[in-house]
Amino acid sequence: MDCPKRKQTRLPEFDYSSNGAYFVTFCTQDRRCILSDVDVGEGLAPPAVCLSAIGQCVEQEIHAVTKRYESVRIDNYVIMPNHVHLIASICEQTGGASPSPTLADIIRVIKSVSSHRCPELKWQRSYYEHVIRSERDYLEIWNYIDGNPGKWADDKYYIEA
């Protein structure tokens, strides 16, 4: 029996350990809303993301990955009910023999350690990534991440509870 081939989502011949910024989205399995709740607020109050215990675990691992890999920064992120958006930057190594991690290494660590710590957390296979190629692109993505909670009901990952 022939298995369907997965669509290749990565850029061929691109070095995902090279210096640069990357926009990444990864989802919970079956898009289960277990990471947070979004309170859209009333009147002029800004929306607030209230992390669940599982979401707090994911947030801890987002911060921990920058300690594990000195060349990695997480510039901005938001933990939505069933997915995470983040900007990961890989910077030049400042010595040492170990190579820079790839983007896949970074996301693998966040997903595997958080699901190990919270066994009820299961992640969807793979992730979406976009190579950020300009300051304008970077700022648009930054604003998208910051504005995402306010647009939760219109989000393509939205599932009504």
Where are these regions (language model features)?
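Short catalytic/metal-binding and nucleic-acid-binding patches
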Residues: 1-161
